Amino acid sequence: MTSRYIPQLSFSFYRHRTIRADFSGGQITSDAGLLPLRAFDQRHGLTRSLAERVCDDRDDTRVSHPGLSLFRQRLYQIIAGYEDANDADRLRHDPAFQILADQPLGAPLGSQPTLSRWENSPAPRDLLKLQDALLDWFVKICGEQVRKRGEILLDVDSTDDPTYGQQQLSFFNAGYNQHMYHPLLIFERHTGCLLAARLRRGTAASNARIIPLLLRIVPRLQREFPKARIKLRADAGFALPLLYEFCEFFGIQYVIGIAANSRLQEKAQRLQRRLARRYRRTGHPQRSFSSFRYRAYSWSHQRRICYKAEHTESGTNVRFLVTNLKGRSRSVFAFYNDRGECENRIEEFKNGFAADRLSCHRFRANAFRLLLHSFAYNLVNLFRLQLPSSLRSAQIETLRIQLFKIGARIRETARCIRIHLASGWPFQDLFQAASLCNSS
């Protein structure tokens, strides 16, 4: 039998002794910290619920990689920072990911071609079922919190997803000055959960498809939480009369930005002149809030407009909101400005979970990819909600460093699989706490 040659590397910087390194350490992984997350997933049946929603037409007798295994392989590799399907070829022999995917040790996971075929397989009805799973996870895990709080706060926004090839429905968007997709996202503010993620063509308006998406969410939320108030916030890209009417019909309290026009500016002129006089007298920046009733030509009735006027050395600036909230205009603006947290969630979704890595050719495959990254985000977000308070708002990069990325030697015996974690790991207490929270 021919023995495999294992090259040795030498390092001479250590003055006490010569250092030699090789790759003969055996079954060692750098991602053993994902085990508590996998236990959390198992306890609530999260990834299993995804596989049950996708029709798999393959012959069971000839399938080496079941749909559930592929879901788990893809999600946990995204969470670990291996977002590209090409990474699968390098990780398919990693013992930790074999365990996470519930595959026998030594059985290779799906290759990059296998994952690519799988990502192109879901039908439109499968994508709709998966879209509903985002809401199902929220109801299942966060339902008790919502009932105690009595409020659901929806933050609606769109984001850019640059494209670099001949992807279907990738178009040039003049607003972003690039070829792109234009995903639509809905987050729940209090929990940070992503409730909806819809991929759209690059030229889609910010508010395109918002009503159909809300129709899949709002009635379900009202059935599950009949006593909870639902509120909605969005920027001026969603200043759509149909959206106002939708919110009013379903009893949703909303605050939505609205672009200035001559009629709105005329209504705010008196306050602007007053601030300008005060600024000339004091030399200090001035700010004030007020509101009035207004009806645009396309509106069926008057609505409340809150506005903020500022006067500085740069001149006067006025911003307008349309709302059905009561209370002081200053409080309405404070409530609206808090939607900046949604921008932080989107940044983590795109940068931490690489949700903008939609490089398949077919639009439907990229829509499926967006959902995969959405589930990876939600799995981690739901998991961190039950971590110690110091880590409940931790970004994914922090969780990778302090929890997920830990070296371990994996050894299979006749009775069990033993995972020997690094003795010098500085975050052992966190790992133990997360494991105890999710022990069966």
Regions found by a protein language model. Name each.
Residues 361, 366, 373, 380-440:
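C-terminal, non-catalytic "cap/extension" segments appended to globular domains
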Residues 244-253:
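Short, surface-exposed basic-aromatic patches at helix termini and helix-loop junctions that form
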Residues 1-205, 211-224, 407-440:
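Dynamic "connector" segments at or just before major functional cores
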Residues 40, 329-372, 376-383:
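Short amphipathic alpha-helical "interface-anchor" segments enriched in bulky aromatics
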Residues 165, 240-245, 265-269:
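A short acidic (Asp/Glu
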Residues 4-19, 253-354, 436-440:
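An anionic, glycine-rich sequence signature occurring as long contiguous blocks
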Residues 157, 227-238:
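Acidic/histidine-rich, metal-coordinating catalytic segments
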